[in-house]
UniProtKB/Swiss-Prot annotation:
Protein species of origin: Dictyostelium discoideum (Social amoeba)
Family membership noted in the UniProt record: Belongs to the glycosyl hydrolase 3 family.
Active site: D363
Principal subcellular localization: other
Gene Ontology cellular component terms for the protein in this record: lysosome
Protein name: Lysosomal beta glucosidase
Gene: gluA
Propiece span(s): 25-69
Reactions it catalyzes: Hydrolysis of terminal, non-reducing beta-D-glucosyl residues with release of beta-D-glucose
Subcellular location: Lysosome
């Protein structure tokens, strides 16, 4: 890095003489997809810096509509106009109301109370329902909901809703399908999003979303509450595992890939979304993922520049780039303003800058929470008014009729005009039209799609995703893969070594995760997977003991048993981490690993036997660095899902070559919290992460050579330095070679470093990634094209800004310099 910078400094005078500046002119810049946009160059008072400003409408220009789009929109608008002209105030408010399924079921049952449902349908015309009857726990002795029960339930609700509606308006049902259709029995469960991100392979995000949509739509539910697009920079936060990690670019690319997978590459604004696709929900818009306290739904203090630099891009890519049909609003507050009351962000930014045309739904009880939780409203009426003024469309009430009753009174009193209802109702009806609910509201229990739930090829896709996610962080003396010629006895221990429940984490069968492994009809634990692929014979013997159970007092007897078995083992594999959790119940006060798990690990390391540490965890729990470095190997498994056990076993035995990379910074101490890899230059050396973002080893070695810019102008006499014109796209190529003896996949990461800017730049930012699969001694040239937006930052005026200057492009150990004028 220092060499490149020095060459830049030496060549600046020559470059400035060679390249002229223009001021106040209109120029064209390269943007997403190779398109161009016209921007106005802002003059500078002095010096030779050039500065350009971009808007999201230029970065993501609206697509050209074809005749099919035009016909669809015309037919939809005519239909919705006619329907709305016949709707009463009560019907319109009903469309804006969403209730939980448990408002329709009796305690400890999943049976729909049809009398209650008919009352809601005929009196309040409720337009949406959500959730699983067993989300919060067992309903009597019922653990899960299978496809036939779901289909019967949805058909019952839909039939009674349509019968009760004067205009035969169908309801829309939504479900948290977070890592697969996790509330549908037998559905395939994938790694949670941090694991997906660790693959650095957008194909896995697309495939996971496609299968999730298919399995959700198969039971009659066309609305999926996913993906989470928050940036995972607060490791204390209970929902960090639902994010795609700490990097805005990874979250943007993986999130957009998921949106396209969920919706079949379509959006609901200019065309239909047909089965097996569902409409998805970009959530939680936005700033939710970095609560200052680390506790769920608590206050976030994020300056406007940081919001726009790090937290908004993933939503822009998903909404404006990929066409997400709905958004769910951040339950918390940002800079003292609950997002549900923010006209700036829900209307000016979301509807204005991001051009969002879809439905904005609240999260759980969030309008009511403006009164008793946020204290911005002194009454339910004031809370509803604040939320409507801000721009919500649908209220996830979800447990009573307060919203429709009070809103009807407010409209009757003239406090809320009917025209405000019409804005939201039109969006909701447009969505229902796009999903085909008016023409085909009832799911078919005999449809072929129902039989595909949990099919073998889906579970194989989940296993393949887990294989590419698992990240080898440490491998002393190449202890992995385990050599069966020299290793005959293995001890497998730890609380997550034989637990499918722990592999899945939260949002699995129930909101807080499964109670027991028997709730999963498919899947393998690590122990089962290891025994299956090794046959567990006398030639390779696997011993198992739990060692310790998470959440119970220290049981030295269990630890002693593990230590005793370790004495007769050649290698010890210990699997530690966390129990399933989600949202507020998952709040913690200390990021440190459970001390009893640390004690188990310490005593196993003290035996002197090689210890392979496997981490199965929702958050990067802090471990004593010296203890971790004493382990022979470290594998990060994240929450790999039901199918995760066998991929982990295959990596241990060398049947699969690990290729995951960390999508977040793994802290070594509490002082590392809140400092991501893209920190400022002034923060260099202030943290000591246990492992860095992008870390990940392989059983082979990859070499990078010949990094070059194919359409830049080389600087004469300055090898590796180039010049270019601000606002253009540039293509960089690098050759990747497998120098080892085994086939392997490699995630090739391209970073951009802005050396000087009007706003202090980050040391580096990821601007491209690709996955390659190479046989030994084979090479492949990788190409990355960076458009103008990817050289931008958020300027002193909080606008997207391009500025002439010096940049470093980095891929592995390769670097080049680029001066843009």
């Amino acid at each position: 890095m220092k060499t490149i910078k020095s060459l830049f400094l030496l060549s600046l005078l020559i470059v400035n003489l060679l390249i002229s500046s223009t001021y106040g002119s209109s120029i064209r810049v390269s943007i997403v997809g190779g398109e161009e946009a016209e921007v106005i160059e802002k003059p500078r008072t002095f010096g030779n810096k050039r500065e350009l400003k971009l808007e999201y409408s230029q970065i993501y220009p609206k697509k050209q509509l074809n005749q099919e789009n035009i016909n669809f929109m015309s037919a939809r608008d005519t239909f919705v106009d006619n329907l709305m002209s016949k709707m009463s105030i009560t019907e319109k408010i009903g469309q804006m109301t969403q209730l939980d399924i448990t408002t329709l079921t009796s305690p400890n049952t999943i049976t729909i109370n049809e009398t209650t449902l008919a009352y809601y349908a005929k009196t309040y015309y409720i337009g949406s329902y959500l959730n699983s009857p067993v989300s919060g726990g067992l309903a009597g002795d019922i653990h899960h909901i299978n496809s036939s029960v779901w289909l019967d339930m949805i058909n019952t609700i839909q039939t009674i809703v349509i019968e009760g509606s004067p205009n035969k308006i169908p309801m829309i049902y939504g479900l948290d399908s977070v890592h697969g259709a996790n509330y549908v029995h037998k559905a395939t469960l994938f790694p949670h999003n941090t694991g997906l991100a660790a693959t650095f392979n957008i194909e896995h995000a697309t495939t996971a979303a496609q299968i999730t949509s298919k399995d959700t739509v198969a039971v009659g539910i066309p609305w999926v509450f996913a993906p989470v697009l928050g940036i995972g920079v607060q490791p204390l936060w209970s929902r960090i595992y639902e994010t795609f990690g700490e990097d805005p670019y990874v979250a943007s690319m993986m999130g957009a890939a998921a949106v396209r997978g969920f919706q079949g590459g379509n959006n609901s604004f200019d065309g239909p979304i047909n089965a097996p696709s569902a409409v998805c929900t970009a959530k939680h818009y936005f700033g939710y993922s970095d609560p200052t306290s680390g506790k769920d739904r608590t206050a976030a203090w994020i300056p406007e520049r940081m919001l726009r630099r790090y937290f908004l891009p993933s939503f822009a890519e998903a909404i404006t780039g990929a066409g997400a049909g709905t958004i769910m609003i951040n339950s918390g507050e940002v800079n003292g303003v609950p997002m549900h009351t923010s006209y700036k962000y829900l209307t000016e930014v979301l509807r204005g800058e991001l051009q969002f045309e879809g439905v904005a739904v609240t999260d759980w009880q969030d309008i009511e929470k403006l009164v008793y939780f946020h204290h911005t409203a002194g009454s339910a009426e004031e809370a509803i008014l604040q939320a409507l003024d801000a721009g919500i469309d649908m209220s996830m009430v979800p447990l009573d009729l307060s919203f429709p009753i009070i809103l009807a009174e407010m409209v009757a009193a003239g406090t809320v005009p009917e025209s405000r209802l019409d804005l939201s109702v039109r969006r909701i009806l447009n969505l229902k039209y796009a999903l085909g609910l008016f023409s085909n509201p009832y799911p078919n229990p005999n449809a072929a799609i129902v039989d595909t739930i949990g099919q073998v090829q889906d579970r194989e896709a989940a296993a393949a995703t887990a294989e590419e996610s698992i990240t080898l962080l440490q491998n002393k003396n190449n202890i992995l893969p385990l050599n069966t010629n020299t290793i005959k006895n293995v001890l497998l221990t730890g609380p997550s070594a034989d637990s499918i429940r722990n592999l899945n984490g939260g949002w699995s069968v129930h909101w807080q995760g499964a109670y027991e492994d028997s709730e999963f009809p498919f899947g393998t634990s690590i122990l089962t997977g290891l025994r299956e692929i090794t046959n567990d014979t006398a030639d390779f013997n696997i011993q198992y003991t739990i060692g310790h159970e998470i959440g119970v007092p220290t049981n030295q007897t269990s630890i002693d048993e593990a230590v005793e078995l370790a004495q007769s083992s050649d290698v010890v594999v210990v699997v530690i981490g966390e129990l399933p959790e989600a949202e507020t119940p998952g709040d913690i006060y200390d990021l440190s690993m459970d001390p009893n798990e640390v004690l188990l690990l310490q005593q196993l390391v003290d035996t002197g036997k090689p210890v392979v540490l496997i981490l199965v965890e929702a958050r990067p729990r802090i471990l004593p660095p010296d203890l971790v470095y004493s382990c022979a190997a470290v594998l990060m498994a994240y929450l790999p899902g039901s199918e995760g056990g066998k991929p982990i076993a295959n990596i241990l035995m060398g049947n699969v070559n690990p290729s995951g990379r960390l999508p977040l910074t793994y802290p070594g101490t509490t002082g590392d919290i809140g400092v991501p890899y893209y920190h400022k230059y002034s923060e260099n050396g202030v943290t000591t992460p246990l492992f860095q973002f992008g870390d990940g080893l392989s059983y082979t070695t990859f070499n990078y050579t010949n990094l070059a810019c194919s359409n830049c102008k080389p600087i004469s006499g300055q090898s590796g330095n180039y010049t270019g014109v601000l606002g253009q796209s540039y293509t960089f190529t690098v050759t990747v070679t497998n120098n080892g003896n085994v086939q392997g996949k490699d995630s090739v990461l391209l970073y951009l470093s802005d050396l000087w800017a009007q706003v202090t730049p980050e040391v580096k930012m990821l601007r491209g990634f690709q996955k390659v699969d190479l046989m030994p001694a084979k090479s492949q040239q990788i190409s990355f094209t960076l458009n103008a937006y990817e050289f931008s930052f958020i300027g002193v005026d909080n606008k997207i800004t391009l500025e002439s200057g010096q940049f470093i492009i980095m891929v592995g150990n390769q670097q080049l310099g680029l001066y843009l004028q």
